[in-house]
Amino acid sequence: MKTIKVTQTKSSSHRLKNHKLCLQGLGLRRIGHTVEVQDTPSNRGMINKVYYMVSVEE
């Protein structure tokens, strides 16, 4: 299955609880942390919810 590289670019402090949970679900822990996740609808939904805190490479 296709994978996507997701990097956290902004801090998660003072953010909505659901947005923090999305970052946790993607496996992101700190600014500059990069993970590879599978390209699934659920992961895409989490990325779309926190688009302003992450950068995405396909």
From Swiss-Prot:
Keyword Ribonucleoprotein present in the record's keywords: the answer is yes
Q: Name one GO molecular function term.
A: structural constituent of ribosome
Protein origin, superkingdom: Bacteria
Q: What InterPro entries does the annotation carry?
A: Ribo_uL30_ferredoxin-like_sf, Ribosomal_uL30_bac-type, Ribosomal_uL30_ferredoxin-like
List, in alphabetical order, the GO biological process terms annotated in this UniProt record.
Answer: translation
Q: Which UniProt keywords apply?
A: Ribonucleoprotein, Ribosomal protein
Q: Which family does it belong to?
A: Belongs to the universal ribosomal protein uL30 family.
Q: What is this protein called?
A: Large ribosomal subunit protein uL30
